[in-house]
Amino acid sequence: MKLIKICVLKNSIFRDTFYSLFDIIYPRSENSLIFANQLRRILLGKSEGLRFLKISGFIANKNSKFSVYQKINEFSEFEEINESVFQLFLNIKNIDLYYRSCDANKRFFGTLEAYYPKTYSQDDIILSKNIKLIKKNQHIFSLSSLKLKMKFILEAKKGIGSFFTPVKRVNYIIEENKLSFSRVVLELETDKRRGCFSSTIDAFKVLNFFALNM
C-alpha cells in the first residue's frame, strides 16, 4: 500500500450539499492523468448508497362499501393522478436516503398512503427508524380525486454505482513539477449521505493508497 498525502483546502455546506477542495500529493511514479481519472471514476461509479428499488402500489375506490385494493404497476394509467404511474415510481426511486453504518445489514422499508386530493412529497413517507430522508418536500405525485385512495409499500436496497453514489460532482487539476512527487487539486461535491473526505478516503483504499491527512 502506497502513502498519499491529503490536505483540506476548503470545506463548506450549502443546503443539502457538502463541498470540499483537496490538495493531494502522491508519488511521481504514478501517471498523473491515469491516477486522477481512476480517482474520479471510483468516486462517481463505485460508491455505495441506498435507494427505494422495490415499490408495491395498491389502489381502491373510496366510494365502495368495502375497500378492495388492487395492485398496480408502473404501466398503469389513472386520470385522477396528475403524473403517470411510471413517473411516480421514478420519483420515489430518485429519493436520497441515509442509513447509519451500524444498520448496514438490516432491511429498509417505507410506506406511503394517499387518501385525499393533494400533492404528496417524500415527507409523507413513513420510514423505518434506521433510514432518513436527505432532502425535504421532494415532489412525488398529485392526487386530484376524492374517489381513489392509494397505498405504497417501499423497500430500499443498497447498491454501488452512479445511481446510488452520494458523490454529485468531481473535478481535478493536475500540477506537474520536477520533484519526486506530483499533486492533484480535487474539487468534490456530495449530498448529505456521506461527506467529501470520507468518500475520498474510501476511493484511495480502492486504489490501494494509504491517506495521511496533513
Swiss-Prot record:
This is DNA-directed RNA polymerase subunit alpha. DNA-dependent RNA polymerase catalyzes the transcription of DNA into RNA using the four ribonucleoside triphosphates as substrates. InterPro entries: RBP11-like, RNApol_insert_sf. It comes from Euglena viridis. It is found in: Plastid, Chloroplast. One of its GO terms (biological process) is DNA-templated transcription. Keywords: Chloroplast, DNA-directed RNA polymerase, Nucleotidyltransferase, Plastid, Transcription, Transferase. Its main location: plastid. In plastids the minimal PEP RNA polymerase catalytic core is composed of four subunits: alpha, beta, beta', and beta''. When a (nuclear-encoded) sigma factor is associated with the core the holoenzyme is formed, which can initiate transcription.
